[in-house]
């Protein structure tokens, strides 16, 4: 960030890491928002915005960002995040649909089974 203050991915990576690894959500939000200002159409930045909104319990906003990210790039982590948002929001059917779509693209991804198991979804592998 010091070397290249215009490098959106650096802000995004730092913000997402803070979001996932610490309780410093406000600081994470600042970095993710800076990344978004620099590159609002980058799928990973949109994913981070969505995941941040999810952590803040802003589920509708989270779904918007994550769907926007998926329109730009089909990426397993984005599908996993979107499914978890839907599940937490209570939309179990939509969560299952998102995971089915991901399973078509990544049939052997262990992360899919792990998420189903963690959320205690039906048909989760034990």
PLM feature segments, named:
Residues 3, 38, 71-72, 105:
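Structural marker of alpha-solenoid helical repeat scaffolds
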Residues 8-17:
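Amphipathic alpha-helical repeat scaffolds of TPR domains
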Residues 10, 45, 78-79, 112:
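TPR alpha-solenoid repeat register
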Residues 13, 48, 81, 115-118:
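Canonical tetratricopeptide repeat
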Residues 17-18, 52, 85:
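Residue-level signature for tetratricopeptide repeat
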Residues 20-21, 55, 88, 118-122:
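Register position in tetratricopeptide repeats
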Residues 21-34, 56-68, 90-101:
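Structural signature of tandem alpha-helical TPR/SEL1-like repeats
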